[in-house]
């Protein structure tokens, strides 16, 4: 049973998701663990006191070689019991980056894992350009298998043999990503297929999109989640020319409304 809930559960998974793939993975893990709160980190987490949780997990993607948005600051605000079991899993497109290492530095992970999802990075590396090439269906199947692996490890409280590597190059890229992205956000535009439904406004975690006469206008506070691009029902939103001919692939099990929730409880 899935519901919104604010009581303390046995397990908590903190999740950041832009195209729904990480949230779907978090749900799969939670269903296997049972009695789990999934706390969204698209904005400041609704629940930061995790001191009563037996297990605390983190599910997130790699953005620009590091953590997405303000996730690093959010994780620093979370209170975890000293004896809690802590795990994390990262999804990435071309390379793993240093996100797992950053989480480990903050919370001292007991277990970590990662999965390459070549079908998620619409503007950097679409799955048709990846080596080896893969389909959306195959990518999702791989993620589902990885979710089951992580869930089994977390349930058994398995410990990883090695800590996540720092990857100095990716740490440098992470610092430069915000500068590069600030130029990219100026290239958002909407074609004539837009119906003014406001989905983009609702899924933007930064409040960066406004509707003016039923047309979205974009501010400069974008963190690159691309939820607006992925979940537009008419595929009317683009970033420059690069996304025009690239297919969208939001997770079919995650609706736009799911991304706007603060906490999802799974029994």
What is the role of each PLM region?
Residues 162-170, 178-197, 207-212:
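A charged, amphipathic alpha-helical module
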Residues 189-190, 195, 199-217, 223, ...:
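Iron-sulfur cluster-binding cysteine motifs and their immediate structural context
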Residues 2-12, 20-25, 31-46, 50-60, ...:
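FMN-binding flavodoxin-like domain, especially the glycine-rich phosphate-binding loop
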